[in-house]
From Swiss-Prot:
The keyword Cell division does not apply. This is Type IV pilus assembly protein PilF. Disulfide bonds: none annotated. It comes from Neisseria gonorrhoeae. The keyword Transferase does not apply.
Amino acid sequence: MSVGLLRILVQNQVVTVEQAEHYYNESQAGKEVLPMLFSDGVISPKSLAALIARVFSYSILDLRHYPRHRVLMGVLTEEQMVEFHCVPVFRRGDKVFFAVSDPTQMPQIQKTVSAAGIAVELVIVEDDQLAGLLDWVGSRSTSLLQELGEGQEEEESHTLYIDNEEAEDGPVPRFIHKTLSDALRSGASDIHFEFYEHNARIRFRVDGQLREVVQPPIAVRGQLASRIKVMSRLDISEKRIPQDGRMQLTFQKGGKPVDFRVSTLPTLFGEKVVMRILNSDAASLNIDQLGFEPFQKKLLLEAIHRPYGMVLVTGPTGSGKTVSLYTCLNILNTESVNIATAEDPAEINLPGINQVNVNDKQGLTFAAALKSFLRQDPDIIMVGEIRDLETADIAIKAAQTGHMVFSTLHTNNAPATLSRMLNMGVAPFNIASSVSLIMAQRLLRRLCSSCKQEVERPSASALKEVGFTDEDLAKDWKLYGAVGCDRCRGQGYKGRAGVYEVMPISEEMQRVIMNNGTEVGILDVAYKEGMVDLRRAGILKIMQGITSLEEVTANTND
């Protein structure tokens, strides 16, 4: 206990000067003073927390309702948490909030984390609750992690990974299996195994956000990476270049197999491994669950049910383009049609569809696959991505000769897709005569329905600056914000919803394209014809109580 805290107790007449001197001497003798204060009946943990919060103007956090899995394990070591008697409990931007019962520890905390660019904020907690949380942190290294680190030297003995029962039942395989199982339960899309000079960490990407879940012993970093490479049939002896692989695992008897795409990357302190969980469940391909507004859904369904043409989906990596395309294919997947796809790689396994993984090294490019498809009597073709003029020309030829073609590009919005194709060298006539509809999309985090709370609306001028109209402001709707609870693991968000910019290619737009119209000109026609852009689609989601204002402004352009 610090002298500063004893001084505060004296100033607030909780203890006398003589008592303070007594407790100070006890602390100098190595004894814990706060438990003595509590056991002597001088003050209770609750009263002490209230006093400290009032004196220092800090907020109080009740740890009885705090979801412990939110503890930020990568900010301080367990030893530092015990030494400073604090726990990092949550993060807001570059600020990390530390739960403390003695705020005079703040300088030591700041000194420790300043090199990482972390701004320190404190919240006051009752000392007995903090002790309980520290005990939980200490026990968090489960018996599996302890076993994982016991007797391990930092070496890469590949004899550990022979294919027999003893190897499969070892601590490293079991730890990996548990990590992957935890990732599935948490709804993660990606798993990051990262290795640094003095520590290692594993992070899950859930609803688009990365968060740390565990720190395995640094001594086994090579064994973790090698084991994953064996499971995904990669070369464990090659550590100098990136490798890509794939694995399929079943986590319970009779359960569905789960596919993982694996990527390794040589770094300064070992190979980083990222695993993408591939959701191959066709049952999830429900158009009503994707977040389309009713009029957008109608436009899309009209376009995909045409006998021929091209539907293009655009957006950044991780924006849900593959799911949107496969949802369309799932709708069209009947006994009477022949569907072929070329992907890099195929992420969703859909029965009844002929799926091809492209392999540039072997000459099986998107363009080569497309040429072969046209000799396979196809009705519907999907190309994972139009990357070059050759692929674009073949796809357009297919759309012009009686086939329905689906593909993706990486652009910021729907009108920019036409500009991208023109820049590739595609003739304006070919674009105008083949493209039926372009759809841009983003994924926004859904507010957790269990804990979202109504918040006060910003001023009308502030909302208008975001994109709200006078008509919007006159309507009766509530603005909600993120809070955090056990169901959403303290994030305030659970799941994601799509926002879409659906732009059908009308006759007027065809004329603009034929006349080498600019992106601005195309956008002007789209707005006149009633297109809703991504920001507007996000505003509709805010008014429906699905997402927050912060989420929309962070992920869409005004």
